[in-house]
Structure formats: C-alpha cells, structure tokens
Amino acid sequence: MLISKGNPMLMGCSRYKDGYNFTYESECENAALLIFDAHMKPKERIELDSSMKCGNIFSVHVSGRRLDTCFYCYEIDGLMYLDPYAKAITDCGRFGQTDEKDVYLAAIDVADYDWEDDRPLNYDYSDCIFYKMNVRGFTKSRTSKVKDKGTFSGIINKIPYLKELGITTIELQPAYEFDEIGRFPQLTDTIMSKYGAGTHYSVDKNTRKINYWGYVGGFYFAPKASYSSIASKHPGVFRDYTVEFKNVVKELHRNGIEVVMEMFFTDESTGFILQCVRHWVTEYHIDGVHVYCDESALKALSQDALLADTKIITVYWNGKTGTKKHMANYNNDFQNIARRLLKGDEN
C-alpha cells in the first residue's frame, strides 16, 4: 500500500489517480484514517499529521491495493468519527432501531450505475403539480398493496397511482441519512463538533423518541438506508443500497415525473451545502431541492452554474435569477388552507 499526500480539494472519499483520496476536516493536530475490510474487520491504520494537512483539512492518497469493498472512518483522541461526506453507511437499515453490535462505517466506494439516457426533466414551475410524500409513510400501510412497504422501491410500485393523479413532481421529505433515533451522538447532541460528525460506537440503550419526519441533522450525502429494501432486508450485512434510490429516480423520469428533495440544514457551511446539492444532482439526477438554509448558502445555490437548471425552492427568496426561472418560494399558506378545507377543519 502506497501512502502520499492527497488532494484537499476533493472532500470525502473518492477514486483518484489509480487510488483513493481521503479528505477530512478537523481542527486537531493529528488524526488517523481507519480502513476496514468487507466484513468490517480492521484492516489498515494510517496516521495523519501536519504534513498531510492544509488549513483544517487532512488529505491522504492511498494506492496499490483494491479497497472498493472496504469501509472507513477516522479516529481522533480515541473516538471514531464518520465522514460527513459519507456516500453510504453500514448498520443503518433498521428504522428507529439500534443494536450494541452496530458499527457505523462509511463505504469507500459505491457501484457505478447505468443511467442509460436519463437526465432531469426540467419542467417549468408553471407546468408543475407537486405531490409531497414521506418515503416510509407513503407505502408502509398494510393497504398500500406494494411488496416493499415503506421503501424507495415501494414508490416505483405506486407510479401508476401517481400518474393517475396527474402530478408532475414528487417532493420527498428528508430521504438522506437523517438521525431519527440518536444513533450518532456527536451529530445529534452537538450538530457538528469541531472534530467531525458522528461516532460509530454508540452502545448505550437509546431512549430517544423517534424523529419520524427527518427535519434534523444527518449525513447529507447518503440516501436513508432504512428507506431502502436492500438495506432493511439485510441488517448487519452491507449491500450497496444507493442503487435503489437511483432506480427510483430513473423510473420516475421514465414516466414523466420529477424528483425534488427536501434538505434541512442546520449550521453547515455554505461550501458544504453547495457540494451536497451538487452531489445529489450529478450522482442521483434529482430535479431540484427544497432547502432550509441561511441566506448566504441560498445565494450561492442560486448563482452556481452547475445548478442553473435545477429547481431551488425555499421560503424566502427575493433575489435575482438567471434566464431560466429555477428559484422559487414555497407557499405554505396555500398548502395549509387547502389541507384544512379538504379535511373539513373548522379553523
């Protein structure tokens, strides 16, 4: 195995120059990259010091060995931390449940995907009819008549129903790896510590109430594992579940339906938010995002050339836009009034 200084511009883990580039932000002077084999057993430990640091970013390049099926995390002061840029995470397949045997690690690589000729649909807002859904709640009911209830695959089973409704766009409530049960203490308790996000050995019995809706911090670059039939059917065994989300997007697009994701950010930096949205647009072909973030991040999203065709929806946009109207305000007042009318509420 060959170890050298990496490219600090590539956050997270990525294939790079016949090897793998690992980059991690931390204010610590020293850290360690821990690599685990396909069975999640310790494989390599790589010390990170000031020679591999630029500003607050550690970066290391690893080559000479195939690591595609391996996992990783970082160790700082004896604690193990997940990468905030993790693309897929182990042992998160059971919604609202944890086990003392769970080990939370990030997958080094995810499978290549054949998108065929798929691309975002880019409907004008004036032509859109939105349908907002919670992935789990949409098909979890016994009456849903789908095979994989409460999962991304369940949405595919309901495409004929969605088309019958006449909708053009589905909006997914948080479907990234949000922390619904407090399995990542560092993340849940401090949002984002100066050392990183999340520790992998949370062994105390969890007494937190389940956050069903997902408006909480999380690992924003990874799909929600427990929303995947692949991960939920095989707890304790990692299988690349990212393909399931991609299947959903491709099949919805094939049937003329856009996909917009809700993303609830807390105190994440503008750069992090921009990279996150770019990731979902390029890696998962989503058509847009409904974001909760501060004004500086929103402005950066609105001006990003890569996102010029991507729907960016918020609750307080009053700025300028380009030749294509891709920015929009979310009108909750109309939604709430319409819901009360349909339900027959008195107020």
Regions found by a protein language model. Name each.
Residues 276-278, 282-347:
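Active-site-proximal helices and loops of the catalytic beta/alpha 8
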Residues 25-31:
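Short proline/glycine-enriched turn/loop motifs at strand-loop junctions of beta-rich domains
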Residues 1-19, 43, 52-132, 139-146:
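The feature marks proteins involved in alpha-glucan
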Residues 24, 74, 133, 162, ...:
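Conserved, mostly hydrophobic/aromatic
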Residues 129-131, 170-172, 259-261, 289, ...:
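Hydrophobic faces of well-ordered beta-strands that scaffold small-molecule active sites
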Residues 39-47:
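Surface-exposed loop/edge segments in extracytoplasmic proteins
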Residues 144-151, 182-254, 265-283:
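Aromatic- and acidic-residue-enriched carbohydrate-binding clefts of CAZyme catalytic domains
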Residues 107-178, 183, 211-214, 219:
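An acidic-aromatic substrate-binding cleft motif
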